[in-house]
Amino acid sequence: FAIQIAKIASYEKRFHNKYNYPIISTPKYINGRKIPESAFILSIIRQESEFDISANSHAGAKGLMQLMPYTAKLVAKQAKLPYVKSRLTTDPEYNINLGSHYIAGLILNYDGAYPYAIAAYNAGPNRVKYWKKINKDPQKKQIDYVDWIELIKFKETRNYVQRVLENYNVYRYILEQRPIEMKNFFRDNPLF
């Protein structure tokens, strides 16, 4: 609830970035897979659960990174980690490891296109495949990424992608004292 209170305070011009943008440890590698930088993982956690380890969504997603149990089970197998459903909402490190491994795989699957990976994390890879087909494909220079995001059919996913990218820029500034240039959000190779 600290993030919600910090958001309310910021509306009154009292900024508490320490609470509005919490910082926790994130992995760099999981069983050989390179994981995106902390700023990106923290951006997803902030948007998914506001750092509430016990968060449960109406759809059944669990923990800090709001993993669906079925997805978590598949990712655990890929990451060569044991799958224990109860740990999704009780063990922050476990949840972050699985979620980080999953988002890293999505980024690789989309050749570094963060907007695709973020949208797939929220709505699933099949939806992104469909949206690339009907909205055209920025990787083929058929449309610009900003326009592609605006054409996402689900308001929730469109907003989610925008907020994660926004959070990412804020976290980059907090952690490294430098925001990321907008053009680098949309390049077709991983930032990590």
Residue locations for each model-derived region?
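Catalytic glycan-binding domains that act on GlcNAc-containing polysaccharides
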Residues: 1-192
